[in-house]
């Protein structure tokens, strides 16, 4: 009995050669639409599916293969009872289904209007793929051109058929997830930002050497059609990105962009292990880098740096003496790229991509599941800062408090930041007590604490941080407030002549 293959693909990579190889082995090839035309024009012997079903394609191609002659031929078990039923209807078996789906993701990604996107939701394709995958013991299902050679083997093992079936179901499930994400995103009235069921469409975009540590495999995945500034950045110089490089660069860029939105100058952010270690604003990138570097010359070694403005030759040269893992910027001039490639060949130099379609959700892994929340993107302008002390902050202190507040939001809790004149002078992050974070920040600042401001991402349970800050020369403090001992904390600030501002907004980061 002649074997039959149904081929209907949007991605026509290698399909002509594949179909020609099948016919050379005695297969009959069935096809539809554009695939039929492509095979026919290439001189491949091919039969139109409508000749098998006895019905023409309908509704502008929306109905082509949704017919018992197709699905019966795919789903029939290769046993007498099913085969006799096919024969009674005049249907034959279909032994191979080669289908990949309408380019839905690509249509969304290029910003097509909604009617065009909807038209690129494939119906017949997923139905055939799922039918073939269900009956994989008798039908080969191919959704990836890389698997075409498998079908040309004399025998295909049961385990290989099962692998192809699993791949097929993954293909359709990812496709459905992309459609779900689009329709939910396009809806003006979502029932909730955190639905009862959350479908996540992830596909791998980068394979890294390993994860956080050499014994952990690692990779980078895209969520739906989102484009990320780091994930999709152009690497213009240096080595391939590592897992930790991606994480740190994303943390640095996130803080850099938040500060750039509220500051007038060029912003530079240095990050180590996802925590800021030097942050500064200045008139130009070179000056901002030098201020951020000098904020903590020890910690910036081996760090990741993000800047808010283009990096030119002068800024590049200023980085000569510091070992860095990654530099990310909105633009890097050609002479700077050339200099980095020659003088710092191991430094990964990235031009950030324009972010789009980014989820508002922040997803954290748990054993057996995930904890999901909305990202903390609250801007300063959403706050209602309240001065709770007799002494009011000066204009410069207000500017520094705002700068320190944005920075401390991006540090791991417990966190305290000291800043003065648009640069961090002391940071304490990841501490298990508030006072320890403050002690670390003060020690980091040294004499630079004199005249600085202090910001904390959460309230003070006691007045110890206020007393330490005042003793170190800090003149203004910003914190959320809301502790039981707020009156004692305020009294200590008044006693010591320190300004204190409550924001009413906590910013834990774990």
From Swiss-Prot:
GO terms for molecular function: IMP cyclohydrolase activity; phosphoribosylaminoimidazolecarboxamide formyltransferase activity. Keywords: Hydrolase, Multifunctional enzyme, Purine biosynthesis, Transferase. It comes from Deinococcus deserti (strain DSM 17065 / CIP 109153 / LMG 22923 / VCD115). It catalyses: (6R)-10-formyltetrahydrofolate + 5-amino-1-(5-phospho-beta-D-ribosyl)imidazole-4-carboxamide = 5-formamido-1-(5-phospho-D-ribosyl)imidazole-4-carboxamide + (6S)-5,6,7,8-tetrahydrofolate; IMP + H2O = 5-formamido-1-(5-phospho-D-ribosyl)imidazole-4-carboxamide. This is Bifunctional purine biosynthesis protein PurH. Belongs to the PurH family. Pathway: Purine metabolism; IMP biosynthesis via de novo pathway; 5-formamido-1-(5-phospho-D-ribosyl)imidazole-4-carboxamide from 5-amino-1-(5-phospho-D-ribosyl)imidazole-4-carboxamide (10-formyl THF route): step 1/1; Purine metabolism; IMP biosynthesis via de novo pathway; IMP from 5-formamido-1-(5-phospho-D-ribosyl)imidazole-4-carboxamide: step 1/1. One of its GO terms (cellular component) is cytosol.
């Amino acid at each position: 009995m002649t074997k039959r293959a149904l081929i209907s693909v949007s991605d026509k990579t290698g399909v002509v050669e594949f179909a020609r190889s099948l016919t050379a082995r005695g297969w009959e090839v069935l096809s539809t639409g554009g695939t039929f035309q492509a095979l026919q024009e290439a001189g491949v012997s091919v039969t139109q599916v409508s000749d098998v079903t006895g019905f023409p394609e309908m509704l502008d191609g929306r109905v082509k293969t949704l017919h018992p002659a197709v699905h019966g031929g795919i789903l029939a078990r290769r046993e007498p009872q099913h085969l006799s039923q096919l024969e009674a209807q005049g249907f034959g078996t279909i032994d191979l289904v080669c289908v990949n789906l309408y380019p839905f993701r690509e249509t969304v990604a290029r910003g097509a209007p909604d009617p065009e996107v909807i038209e690129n939701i494939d119906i017949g394709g997923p139905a055939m793929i799922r039918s073939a995958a269900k009956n994989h013991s008798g039908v080969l299902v191919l959704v990836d051109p890389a698997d075409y050679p498998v079908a040309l083997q004399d025998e295909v093992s049961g385990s290989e058929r099962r692998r192809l079936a699993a791949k097929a179901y993954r293909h359709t499930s990812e496709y459905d997830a992309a459609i779900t994400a689009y329709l939910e995103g396009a809806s003006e009235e979502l029932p909730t930002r955190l639905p009862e069921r959350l479908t996540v469409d992830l596909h791998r975009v980068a394979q890294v050497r390993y994860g956080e540590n050499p014994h952990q495999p690692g990779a980078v995945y895209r969520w739906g059609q989102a484009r990320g500034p780091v994930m999709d950045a152009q690497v213009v110089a240096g080595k391939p990105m590592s897992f930790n490089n991606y994480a740190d660069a994303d943390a640095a860029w996130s803080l850099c962009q938040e500060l750039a939105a509220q500051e007038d100058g060029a912003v530079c952010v240095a990050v180590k292990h996802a925590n800021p270690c030097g942050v500064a604003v200045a008139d130009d990138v070179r000056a901002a880098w030098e201020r951020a570097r000098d904020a903590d010359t020890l910690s910036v070694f081996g760090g990741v740096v993000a800047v808010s403005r283009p990096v030119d030759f002068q800024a590049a040269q200023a980085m000569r003496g510091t070992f860095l893992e990654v530099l990310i910027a909105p633009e890097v001039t050609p002479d700077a790229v050339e200099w980095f490639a020659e003088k710092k060949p191991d430094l990964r130099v990235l031009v950030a991509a324009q972010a789009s379609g980014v989820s508002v959700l922040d997803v954290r892994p748990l054993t057996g599941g995930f904890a999901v929340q909305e990202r903390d993107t609250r801007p300063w302008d959403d706050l209602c800062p309240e001065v709770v002390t007799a002494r009011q902050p000066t204009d410069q202190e207000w500017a520094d408090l705002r700068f320190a507040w944005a920075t401390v939001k991006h540090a791991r809790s417990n966190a305290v930041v000291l800043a003065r004149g648009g640069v961090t002078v002391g940071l304490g992050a990841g501490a298990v007590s508030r006072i320890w974070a403050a002690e670390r920040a003060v020690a980091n600042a040294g004499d630079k604490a004199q005249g600085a401001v202090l910001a904390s991402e959460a309230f003070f349970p006691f007045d110890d941080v206020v007393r330490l800050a005042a003793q170190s020369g800090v003149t203004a403090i910003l914190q959320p407030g809301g502790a039981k001992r707020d009156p004692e904390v305020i009294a200590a600030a008044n006693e010591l002549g320190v300004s204190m501002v409550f924001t009413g907004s906590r910013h834990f980061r774990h």
